[in-house]
Amino acid sequence: MSLDMKEHPDAEVQKNQVLTLEDWKEKWVTRHISFHQEQGHQLLKKHLDTFLKGQSGLRVFFPLCGKAIEMKWFADRGHTVVGVEISEIGIREFFAEQNLSYTEEPLAEIAGAKVFKSSSGSISLYCCSIFDLPRANIGKFDRIWDRGALVAINPGDHDRYADIILSLLRKEFQYLVAVLSYDPTKHAGPPFYVPSAELKRLFGTKCSMQCLEEVDALEERHKAWGLDYLFEKLYLLTEK
């Protein structure tokens, strides 16, 4: 399949698909977490210099962070990391697997929510829905790394999600987002199909968009979903 055929005409086919927060929590309980990447994200590694621009002391936000090991990468480089994740299991596993001691406390602003902080203070993970997060007043960010977040959000919630992301960006931000391209008539999602036109609709008024790279990401598990092609595209969004 040529890379020119990557925008599927039936992008609307998934628009009514819905997963609840309980569905996502259940994935962690039943270990249906094939979205977790043990070695971290290879495209992020490759484009890390472009993303960080040699700057130090940045605030980096991880939406729907799971137990992404890249959070430790950034903290080890002297950056401050904030993540949000609905599953307490995912958050606890992150600290355990990275051998980081941490504290936990309830969040006064959001009923039932907690914040987990590494003892060094460089990593803070909020256990709540991203749609409740604005109430916690977490400040603004220089960088956002969005892998497995936008593609996991219910398509009907894209606008709400984009509003939150845009509200968290500081001046001169860099927002790096990985999206997937496949035939949405063959797989209901998640991960959901996010065409470039949808990215443009969500972020194009405030952001300039550049596709840094596109790779063939088809694995055996995707073939089992019924897919015969799957591309991952990495976009860098910057201030207009």
Curated annotation (Swiss-Prot):
UniProt-reported outcome of changing residue 69 to V: In strain: C57BL/6J
PTM annotation (Phosphoserine): residues: 34
GO molecular function terms attached to this record: thiopurine S-methyltransferase activity
Annotated InterPro entries: SAM-dependent_MTases_sf, Thiopurine_S-MeTrfase, TPMT
Residues bound to S-adenosyl-L-methionine: 24-35, 64, 85, 129-130, 147
Localization in the cell: Cytoplasm
UniProt modified residues of type N6-acetyllysine: 53
Entry EC no(s): 2.1.1.67
Listed Pfam families: TPMT
Keywords, in A-Z order: Acetylation, Cytoplasm, Methyltransferase, Phosphoprotein, S-adenosyl-L-methionine, Transferase
Gene Ontology biological-process entries: methylation
The keyword Cytoplasm is assigned to this record: yes
Gene Ontology CC, one term: cytoplasm
Enzyme class, spelled out: transferase
Catalytic reactions on record: S-adenosyl-L-methionine + a thiopurine = S-adenosyl-L-homocysteine + a thiopurine S-methylether; mercaptopurine + S-adenosyl-L-methionine = 6-methylthiopurine + S-adenosyl-L-homocysteine + H(+)
SUPFAM superfamilies noted in UniProt: S-adenosyl-L-methionine-dependent methyltransferases
Binding site for substrate: 35
Family: Belongs to the class I-like SAM-binding methyltransferase superfamily. TPMT family.
UniProt subunit comment: Monomer.
Reported function: Catalyzes the S-methylation of thiopurine drugs such as 6-mercaptopurine (also called mercaptopurine, 6-MP or its brand name Purinethol) using S-adenosyl-L-methionine as the methyl donor. TPMT activity modulates the cytotoxic effects of thiopurine prodrugs. A natural substrate for this enzyme has yet to be identified.
Name of this chain's protein: Thiopurine S-methyltransferase
